[in-house]
């Protein structure tokens, strides 16, 4: 598997799995919006009111509506969760 695929596939899969709305900008400037239904090495199937097959070579940018966690394996996911929890500030007691 190429290095580019090792980041691309987990990222697209997380967007698909969590059904996160995305904006896909094409190299010609057109903006497409929807949810990623499926993808393979060459295309992304984008679902909105209709399904569109978008060729990856025509895509400039994929912008999710919210942030997404996209780790390649469960160990990375667990490490990320632990780092996020330890970085969260402790709640301060409120004065009565």
UniProtKB/Swiss-Prot annotation:
GO terms for biological process: regulation of DNA-templated transcription; regulation of RNA stability; regulation of translation, ncRNA-mediated. Residues 65-96 are annotated as: Disordered. It comes from the Bacteria. The keyword Nucleus does not apply. Residues 70-96 have a biased composition (Low complexity). Residues 9-68 form the Sm domain. Keywords: RNA-binding, Stress response. SUPFAM superfamilies: Sm-like ribonucleoproteins (SSF50182). Signal peptide: none annotated. It holds the Pfam family Hfq. GO terms for cellular component: cytosol. One of its GO terms (molecular function) is RNA binding. PROSITE patterns: SM (PS52002). RNA chaperone that binds small regulatory RNA (sRNAs) and mRNAs to facilitate mRNA translational regulation in response to envelope stress, environmental stress and changes in metabolite concentrations. Also binds with high specificity to tRNAs. Belongs to the Hfq family. Homohexamer. NCBIfam families: Hfq, PRK00395.1. This is RNA-binding protein Hfq. It comes from Mannheimia succiniciproducens (strain KCTC 0769BP / MBEL55E).
């Amino acid at each position: 598997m190429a290095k580019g695929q090792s980041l691309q596939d987990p990222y697209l899969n997380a967007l698909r799995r969590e059904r996160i709305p995305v904006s896909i900008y094409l190299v010609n400037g057109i903006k497409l919006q929807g949810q990623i239904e499926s993808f393979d090495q060459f295309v992304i199937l984008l679902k909105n009111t209709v399904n569109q097959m978008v060729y990856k070579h025509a895509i400039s940018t994929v912008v999710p509506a919210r942030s997404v966690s996209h780790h390649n394996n469960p160990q990375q996911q667990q490490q990320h969760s632990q780092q996020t929890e330890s970085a969260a500030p402790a709640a301060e007691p409120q004065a009565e």
